C-alpha cells in the first residue's frame, strides 16, 4: 500500500509525499504558482500571500507555500476568487513601491515586474503618500534601495540559515518594518552576494554592476568558476569584449545555486592589468615585442643555458595547458615540473588527492573532522554545504587548527600534528565519536599539507581514516580540500616531477645553486622572484602580476573566461568551461602558445588542434573525457615517499588574504574595496584585518 498522498490540482491528479506543501504539489502537476517570499532552499515564511490558492471546502484562499497537502485534496489555482485575491495582494504590494523601473538595475529580470504584469491590475486606488525608507549601508558589494523592499525576508533567511552570519534582520512592525544590518555595517559573509539573486525586487542589487548594462544587452555564456577548487557553475555576461557580471547556475551536485562573493564580483579584474602582447626584458626593462622575437629569445636562452629547464604551474591554469606544457617538457628532456606551487605534499593514486566523499556526499555524513583547513574561506560554497548538514542535526564537528568562526559549531580540539597523533592513538575523545559514526569523514586542507612535514600529516590522517572506519566498500570519508582550480587537473595529467625530477622546493633550490638556469612560470604568480636567483624566467599568464614583474620573457595568455577548457574540481569532477569573451590584443590560448613554442624550439608537439590534444590527453587520463561525472578513484594509499618527522608547529592558515589570492583578484578594484572594508571592521574590534 502506497503512503503517497493523492491530490488534484486544476483537474490534474498527482501523487506526492506526505508533508509536501500545496505549492510543491502544484509544481508536480506543472502548474505555476506566483510567489515572492517562498524559496525552495529557505524556510517557509508565508508573508507575501501571493501564492494564494483555493482549496475545496476551505472557507477562503490559503497560502499554498505553508499549507501541507491532505489526502484527496482538490486545489483550484485559476478560479475567480484566486485571481481576485492575487490582484488584491499585488495592489497592496505596489502601494508603497516607488515604481522606478527605468532607473532600477533589476529592470528586465524582476519578479515584481513579471508578476504585476501577469497577476495584477493596470491601475491603483491608492491616493496617499507612499512610504520612503532610508538606504542601508551594506558594504562595497550590495547596493540598497530599501523603498523598493516588499518585506519578503528572503535575505534575512538566507543570511541566518545558509550563510550562517545573521547580520541582516528586520526591525519595526507593520508599515514601519525595515530590513537592515542593525549597525549599518558592511556584510561579513563570503556568500553575501547571493541576496542579490534572492531579492525579488530591486531593493538589493549589485553595487559594482550598478547602472552599467541592461540584461538584454548582454551575451550570456554558461561556464565554470576558477576562483577556488569547488568548480561552481556560473554564467558570464559579456557586452562586446568586456565581462559585465558573473552569476551562479544551478548544479545540485556542486554549488546548488549559490556562489561565493569572490567568484561573483571578481569580474572587473578580468578587464584590468591584462597582458595583451609579448614582452622581452632588455637592459633590465620590459619592452613590448612580437611573438617570433619572444620565441627567438627563449630558443637562444635554452641553447646557451648551462643548466636545466624547469616548469611550475599556477592555480588558475587549465588542464589542457598543463598537459601541453608537460608534453613540451618531455620533448625538452626535463623531469623538473610541478603544479603544486604552494609546495603541498600530495602524491600517489588519484584517491590520495581528491575530495572522495563528494561535495553532495557531505549531506550523507554523520561526523566530521577538519584538519588544517578553514573551508569558510577556502571553499565558501562547500562550507555552506557543511552548515546545511549541521543544521539537519546529529553531526558532531571537530577541527584541528587555528580557532575561527566557521558558521557552525565546531570543537577546536588542537592546533597541530600532535592532536592528530593523539586521535590516531585513540587518546582523544573525538576518536570515539568518529569510530561510532556510521559515515565519518575528514577534510585535510592545504594548511596541513603545504608544510615540510606535509607527507607525515597526510600519513597520519590516512591512518586515522583507516582506524575509524572512514573507508569502506560503500563509503570513502577521506577528503583533500584544494584551493586551486587547476591543481587536480594538473595532477591528473601528471604535471609532477618525473624520474629524478625536482618538485617545487627542489626547483627553487636548483635555481639558487645554478643547476636550473631557466624556469617557465605558467600562471605561477605566488613564487617569490628573489627565490629563483639568476634563473631566466619565462612567464605565461593573463595578468601583469607578480610572475610577470620578475620575468625575462612574458607570453600573454587567455583568462579562464576566454577559452574552452577542462577544469577538474576538488572532488575530481571534470567540467568544461566555455569561452565567454576573446583574449585582449595578441594574447592566445595557453595550449596554442606551447604548441607554437615547441615548433620554434625544434620539439614539435604531436597535436595541431585542441581536439587532437584532448585525444592524446584522454589516453593518459580517460576519466577526463567523462564530463560532469564523479569517476570512482579507488582507495587512498600511504605515500611511497619517506614520511618526515612531524613538526610541532600549529597548522597555519593557507590563505593570508581571502580577497587577494590570485592575479585576477589582485587586479580587481572590487576585491580591494572588500579587503579594505574587512580591515576597517577588524580595526574597529581590534583585529588585524587579514586571514592569518
Segments and roles (model prediction):
Residues 51-53, 539:
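Glycine-rich beta-alpha loop elements in corrinoid/cobalamin-binding modules
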Residues 58-60, 471:
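A cross-taxa feature marking solvent-exposed loop/turn segments within ectodomains of secreted
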Residues 16-20, 254, 451, 455, ...:
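Short, conserved micro-motifs enriched in small and acidic residues
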Residues 341-630, 681, 685-692:
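Non-catalytic alpha/beta scaffold blocks inside enzyme catalytic domains
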Residues 2-19, 24-27, 35, 39, ...:
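N-terminal export/assembly segments and adjacent metallocofactor-ligating motifs
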Residues 44-49:
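A short, glycine/Asx- and small/polar-enriched loop/turn
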Residues 611-692:
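Long, low-complexity segments enriched in small/aliphatic residues
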Amino acid at each position: 500500500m502506497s503512503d503517497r498522498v493523492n491530490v488534484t490540482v486544476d483537474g490534474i491528479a498527482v501523487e506526492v509525499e506526505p508533508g509536501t506543501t500545496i505549492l510543491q504539489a502544484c509544481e508536480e502537476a506543472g502548474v505555476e504558482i506566483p510567489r515572492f517570499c517562498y524559496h525552495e532552499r529557505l524556510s517557509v515564511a508565508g508573508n507575501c500571500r501571493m501564492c494564494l490558492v483555493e482549496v475545496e471546502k476551505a472557507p477562503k484562499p490559503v497560502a499554498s507555500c505553508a499549507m501541507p497537502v491532505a489526502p484527496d485534496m482538490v486545489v483550484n489555482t485559476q478560479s475567480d476568487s484566486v485571481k481576485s485575491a492575487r490582484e488584491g495582494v499585488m495592489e497592496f504590494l505596489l502601494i508603497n513601491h516607488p515604481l522606478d523601473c527605468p532607473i532600477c538595475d533589476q529592470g528586465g529580470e524582476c519578479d515584481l515586474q513579471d508578476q504585476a504584469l501577469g497577476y495584477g491590475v493596470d491601475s491603483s486606488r491608492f491616493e496617499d503618500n507612499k512610504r520612503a525608507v532610508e538606504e542601508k549601508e551594506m558594504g562595497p558589494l550590495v547596493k540598497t534601495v530599501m523603498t523598493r523592499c516588499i518585506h519578503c525576508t528572503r535575505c534575512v533567511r538566507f543570511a541566518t540559515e545558509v550563510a550562517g552570519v545573521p547580520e541582516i534582520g528586520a526591525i519595526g512592525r507593520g508599515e514601519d518594518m525595515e530590513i537592515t544590518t542593525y549597525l549599518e555595517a558592511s556584510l561579513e559573509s563570503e556568500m553575501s552576494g547571493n541576496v542579490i539573486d534572492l531579492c525579488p525586487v530591486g531593493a538589493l542589487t549589485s553595487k559594482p554592476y550598478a547602472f552599467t548594462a541592461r540584461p538584454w544587452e548582454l551575451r550570456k555564456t554558461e561556464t565554470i568558476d576558477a576562483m577556488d577548487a569547488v568548480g561552481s557553475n556560473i554564467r558570464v555576461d559579456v557586452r562586446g569584449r568586456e565581462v559585465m557580471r558573473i552569476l551562479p547556475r544551478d548544479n545540485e551536485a556542486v554549488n546548488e545555486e549559490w556562489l561565493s562573493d569572490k567568484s561573483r564580483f571578481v569580474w572587473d579584474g578580468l578587464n584590468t592589468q591584462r597582458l595583451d602582447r609579448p614582452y622581452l626584458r632588455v637592459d633590465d626593462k620590459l619592452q613590448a615585442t612580437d611573438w617570433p622575437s619572444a620565441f627567438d629569445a627563449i630558443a637562444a636562452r635554452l641553447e646557451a643555458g648551462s643548466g636545466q629547464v624547469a616548469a611550475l604551474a599556477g592555480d588558475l591554469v587549465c588542464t589542457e595547458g598543463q598537459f601541453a606544457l608537460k608534453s613540451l617538457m618531455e620533448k625538452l628532456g626535463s623531469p623538473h615540473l610541478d603544479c603544486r606551487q604552494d609546495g603541498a605534499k600530495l602524491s600517489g593514486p588519484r584517491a590520495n588527492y581528491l575530495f572522495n566523499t563528494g561535495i553532495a556526499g557531505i549531506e550523507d555524513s554523520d561526523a566530521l573532522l577538519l584538519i588544517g583547513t578553514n573551508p569558510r574561506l577556502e571553499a565558501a560554497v562547500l562550507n555552506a554545504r557543511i552548515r546545511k548538514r549541521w543544521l539537519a542535526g546529529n553531526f558532531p564537528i571537530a577541527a584541528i587548527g587555528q580557532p575561527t568562526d566557521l558558521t557552525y559549531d565546531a570543537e577546536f580540539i588542537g592546533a597541530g600534528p600532535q592532536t592528530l597523533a593523539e586521535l590516531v592513538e585513540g587518546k582523544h575523545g573525538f576518536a570515539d565519536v568518529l569510530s561510532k559514526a556510521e559515515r565519518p569523514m575528514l577534510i585535510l586542507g592545504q594548511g596541513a599539507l603545504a608544510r615540510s612535514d606535509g607527507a607525515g600529516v597526510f600519513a597520519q590522517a590516512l591512518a586515522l581514516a583507516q582506524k575509524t572506519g572512514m573507508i569502506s566498500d560503500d563509503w570513502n570519508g577521506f577528503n583533500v580540500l584544494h584551493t586551486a582550480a587547476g591543481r587536480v587537473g594538473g595532477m591528473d595529467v601528471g604535471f609532477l616531477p618525473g624520474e629524478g625530477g625536482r618538485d617545487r622546493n627542489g626547483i627553487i633550490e636548483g635555481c639558487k645553486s645554478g643547476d636550473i638556469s631557466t624556469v617557465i612560470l605558467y600562471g605561477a604568480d605566488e613564487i617569490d622572484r628573489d627565490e629563483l636567483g639568476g634563473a631566466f624566467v619565462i612567464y605565461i599568464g593573463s595578468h601583469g602580476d607578480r610572475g610577470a614583474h620578475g620575468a625575462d620573457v612574458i607570453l600573454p595568455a587567455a583568462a579562464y573566461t576566454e577559452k574552452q577548457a577542462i577544469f577538474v574540481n576538488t572532488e575530481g569532477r571534470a567540467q568544461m568551461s566555455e569561452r565567454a569573451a576573446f583574449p585582449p590584443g595578441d594574447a592566445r590560448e595557453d595550449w596554442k602558445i606551447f604548441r607554437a613554442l615547441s615548433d620554434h624550439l625544434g620539439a614539435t608537439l604531436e597535436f595541431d588542434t585542441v581536439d587532437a590534444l584532448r585525444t592524446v590527453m584522454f589516453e593518459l587520463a580517460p576519466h577526463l573525457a567523462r564530463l560532469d561525472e564523479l569517476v570512482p578513484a579507488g582507495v587512498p594509499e600511504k605515500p611511497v615517499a619517506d614520511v618526515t618527522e612531524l613538526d610541532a608547529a600549529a597548522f597555519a592558515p593557507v590563505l593570508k588574504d581571502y580577497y587577494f589570492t590570485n592575479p585576477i583578484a589582485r587586479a580587481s578594484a572590487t576585491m580591494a574595496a572588500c579587503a579594505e572594508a574587512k580591515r576597517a571592521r577588524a580595526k574597529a574590534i581590534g583585529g588585524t584585518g587579514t586571514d592569518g
